[in-house]
Swiss-Prot record:
This is Tyrosine--tRNA ligase, mitochondrial. It catalyses: tRNA(Tyr) + L-tyrosine + ATP = L-tyrosyl-tRNA(Tyr) + AMP + diphosphate + H(+). Pfam families: tRNA-synt_1b. Keywords: Acetylation, Aminoacyl-tRNA synthetase, ATP-binding, Disease variant, Ligase, Mitochondrion, Nucleotide-binding, Primary mitochondrial disease, Protein biosynthesis, Transit peptide. Homodimer. Changing residue 202 to A: Mildly decreased tRNA ligase activity. Gene3D superfamilies: HUPs, RNA-binding S4 domain, Tyrosyl-Transfer RNA Synthetase. A motif ('KMSKS' region) lies at residues 281-285. The modification N6-acetyllysine is found at residues 355, 367.
């Protein structure tokens, strides 16, 4: 069947599992052991976990990536389903995999699953996803496309290495499904899939044995992902799919479909799944997502997520989440042994990831917020924007007041509803329970001073007790 004409953009998915006996562990592949090889380099970083299928990957796949062969450059894709309006940290390794391939000169495609998201990928799930309305999926797909393009732009602008890179393209699979008729599609595609094979996937078996079972829509997901791979193979010459290690079943379906139709071999590369300290996969469904959209997770929160990583994880994460050369990572870890209290590896990890996700400005913002919150820095506070303060103190009430002559500390606290009326509120100040811009105030009648109580950005940060913050924006100073 000839693939229909492409019109739009796309974003990927990760899917089912397969019998691990058909996988060739990277450590056993002599062809991947060359110190300068792309696959060997990513194996050393721990970014590429497994290759599929075993047949041909000892020699053929490494040759595909060799700059000295006629097959160079290759096209590789990874899919992302728009089940939310933002990427999250759980998607970063797949994106880092695409970026490393792009840096090596290959062309990469980020495929937004504007069509497949409506079915829901069952891989790694114990129950069916909540169905999304069509307009919600479309809005999410637009947001993911913008997020992917922003990340690609930051990568291009801030992490250049002097090499000639390949292209980064964002597509959406709704472009080739929106004109498909169900009966025509099943007639052309369905005959190439065997029910026994589809039912044998581990992800399918787990769901079929569960009390909730599996819907036809979810079951059909692997067929559509296989067709995506075929379409990109026909249209772009894409021979490699990248995905999380829970996507092996879907990758296998694509391999079998393309091989039956064309006789050609295609390949899959998996990246490891990142889990929380409890072992849960990081993602929206697990309820522990750290988002890459500033409106959902601020640069400061993203930065702190990586700063808080334990010592036993940070070296691995530096290899996975950054482009730092391995010798430099070794040096960072050696310094850490001498001065562990400085948390140098964690800070470098946080800086590299935040810069990739939010750009240099986002990294600067995260550092300002860190200084303001954890180091009581007045200098950091007075250059923070309204947005940064709101991000940093998400639960803090935000008020805007005109500064009247003679406005006192007591007046300010009461206008902001930060203290109770009457003697109790007065005592909270005199007993040292109130600070303004990290400076304790004990005289309720003190008149506010611009430059001390009011920063040069027109803001005052009230702190009542240990953890109750109030933000005041002064107008027409």
């Amino acid at each position: 069947m000839a693939a229909p004409i492409l019109r739009s953009f796309s974003w990927g998915r990760w899917s089912g599992t397969l019998n691990l006996s058909v996988l060739l562990p990277l450590g056993l592949r002599k062809a991947h052991s060359g110190a300068q090889g792309l696959l060997a380099a990513q194996k050393a970083r721990g970014l590429f976990k497994d290759f599929f299928p075993e047949t041909g990957t000892k020699i053929e796949l490494p040759e595909l990536f060799d700059r000295g062969t006629a097959s160079f450059p290759q096209t590789i894709y990874c899919g992302f389903d728009p089940t939310a309006d933002s990427l999250h940290v759980g998607h970063l390794l797949a994106l880092l995999g695409l970026f490393h391939l792009q840096r090596a000169g290959h062309n990469v495609i980020a495929l937004v699953g504007g069509a497949t998201a409506r079915l829901g990928d069952p891989s790694g799930r114990t129950k069916e996803r909540e169905a999304l309305e069509t307009e919600r999926v479309r809005a999410n797909a637009r947001a993911l496309r913008l997020g992917l393009e922003a990340l690609a732009a930051n990568h291009q602008q801030l992490f250049t290495d002097g090499r000639s890179w390949g292209s980064f393209t964002v597509l959406d699979n709704s472009a080739w499904y929106q004109k498909q008729h169900l009966v025509d599609f099943l007639a052309a595609v369905g005959g190439h899939f065997r029910m026994g094979t589809l039912l044998s996937r581990q992800s399918v078996q787990l769901r079929l044995k569960s009390p909730e079972g599996m819907s036809l829509a979810e079951f059909f997901y692997q067929v559509l992902q296989a067709y995506d791979f075929y379409y990109l193979f026909q249209r772009y010459g894409c021979r490699v799919q990248l995905g999380g290690s829970d996507q092996l079943g879907n990758i296998m379906s694509g391999y079998e479909f393309i091989n039956k139709l064309t006789g050609e071999d295609v390949f899959g590369i998996t990246v490891p799944l990142i889990t929380s300290t409890t072992g849960a996969k990081l993602g929206k469904s697990a309820g522990n997502a750290v988002w890459l959209n500033r409106d959902k997770t601020s640069p400061f929160e993203l930065y702190q997520f990586f700063v808080r990583q334990p010592d036993d994880s940070v070296e691995r994460y530096l290899k996975l989440f950054t482009f730092l050369p391995l010798p430099e990572i070794d040096h960072i870890m050696q310094l850490h042994v001498k001065e562990p209290e400085r948390r140098g590896p964690q800070k470098r990890l946080a800086a590299e990831v935040t810069k990739l996700v939010h750009g240099r400005e986002g990294l600067d913002s995260a550092k300002r917020c860190t200084q303001a919150l954890y180091h009581s820095s007045i200098d950091a506070l007075e250059v923070m924007s309204d947005q940064e303060l709101k991000e940093l103190f998400k639960e803090a009430p935000f008020s805007e007041f005109f500064l009247d002559p003679g406005t006192s500390v007591l007046d300010t606290c009461r206008k902001a509803n930060a203290i109770p009326d009457g003697p109790r509120g007065y005592r909270m100040i005199t007993e040292g329970g109130v600070s303004i811009n990290h400076q304790q105030v004990t005289n309720p009648e003190s008149v506010l001073i611009v430059g001390q109580h009011i920063l040069k950005n027109g803001l005052s940060l009230l702190k009542i007790g240990k953890r109750n913050f109030y933000i005041i924006k002064w107008l027409q100073l």
